[in-house]
Amino acid sequence: MATMSSAAVEVISKETIKPRNPTPYQLRNYNMSLLDQYSSLVYVPIILFYPAASDANSTGSKHHDDLHLLKRSLSETLVHFYPMAGRMKDNMTVDCNDEGIDFFEVRIKGRMCDFMMKSDAHLSLLLPSEVASTNFVKEAQVIVQVNMFDCGGTAICFCISNKIADACTMITFIRSLAGTTNIARRGSSIAAPTTNQNLVPSFDSTSLFPPSEQLASQVSYPTQDSTSVDKLVSKRFVFDAAKITSAREKLQSLMHDKYKCHRPTRVEVVSALIWKSAVKSAPPGSISTVTHAMNFRKKMDPPLQDASFGNLCVVVTAVLPATTATTTNPATKKVSSTSNEEQVALDELSDFVALLRREIDKVKGDKGCMEKIIQKFIYGHDASVAKDSDVEDKVTALFMTSWCKFGFYEADFGWGTPVWVTTVPLIEPKYKNMVFMNDMKCGEGIEVWVNFLEDDMTKFEHHLREILQLF
């Protein structure tokens, strides 16, 4: 494969897409929720890959027609997702002034399959240059870049501000846009965003989590620490369906006997495998924590729709005590045989899953739980770790988020569903030890991106290979 570089990227055009109709005066000031206020002012990239059409006219005029429909549909969709076309006034209010979103058309001198095969090295070339360089949200809340490859394939990159949207809101926006575009391709009217009313946004998060006026002037940019970005690396791992199924089956009986738990989910199993590998890589005596982001909408009473706009994602933290973390390190644990070692590993994996599930099950939609969630956002990390300041330096903290079952592979713009949906991890000190999970096209495997320091990554890969041999 030829070496890819920025020279392979040619920006054809840039324009601003505004809502088709002006936002009504009474909706001009959109108040963010408290959870929005604590969210970072960074773009989250989402890239959807679509293969070339099978007909002979898959390039040229067809690309032009597709882009025209996409831009028209964006204009219509923004009428309903009007905060995305606005600008932030401060850390409390979005001025829904219809200034619009940025739209780039880019030609890629290369084949889409080459980018997919060498994704770790080349995905950043598919991002808008301003996102690839700094990633801070300055003006537009959304940037869309349509990357057209020589082979006729297309990769659409959506960069959406995490300040106003979590993954659930992002996919609702993308699927609404896809539905509108698909309707337009069939020659129907695009007077509505989609016939699926589940994709029409509602704006109820502010009433559930009222904003704090004290935070209005505080914008949460990514903070810097002593970690050098050069030492931070991001790698992609694929957990295939067969491995995940094998792990779920082996852990199921253990979890039922020990905890009376149901079969672990795909995400729980992969989380445990990553956690276990990271713990084995940590210094002896380290406390291990996993902070998992979870969609709060279905935990509410009554449950909220997926189309509820904004950040309705809360975090749960599971803490593995130092004694347990120490015993998983081969330098401090002796086993009498290979079979015993395998059984110990399976026991620990089931313990990890049960511990994480217990923390997730604690999250309810009642007022008391919501107040605890708010306190956690205000005061930071989990109290069970923070209360002992002497051990804070010995904490190995992982931060996990999952897009599994969010429906990204259902985004059909009329070209069929995407063959791959992925992100480009943020290589910033704040995102050290970040773990991101997403579905594979088959629906059963899981793609994982991890950010570790270079030395930690080497150890992590070694221990992960060892653990996966159990399944």
Curated annotation (Swiss-Prot):
GO terms for molecular function: acyltransferase activity. The keyword Signal does not apply. It catalyses: (13S,14R)-1,13-dihydroxy-N-methylcanadine + acetyl-CoA = (13S,14R)-13-O-acetyl-1-hydroxy-N-methylcanadine + CoA. Its EC number is 2.3.1.285. It is an enzyme of class 2 (transferase). Keywords: Acyltransferase, Alkaloid metabolism, Transferase. Pathway: Alkaloid biosynthesis. One of its GO terms (biological process) is alkaloid metabolic process. InterPro entries: CAT-like_dom_sf. Belongs to the plant acyltransferase family. PANTHER family: F21J9.9 (PTHR31623:SF17). Acetyltransferase involved in the biosynthesis of the benzylisoquinoline alkaloid noscapine. Converts (13S,14R)-1,13-dihydroxy-N-methylcanadine to (13S,14R)-13-O-acetyl-1-hydroxy-N-methylcanadine. This is (13S,14R)-1,13-dihydroxy-N-methylcanadine 13-O-acetyltransferase AT1. It comes from Papaver somniferum. The gene is AT1.
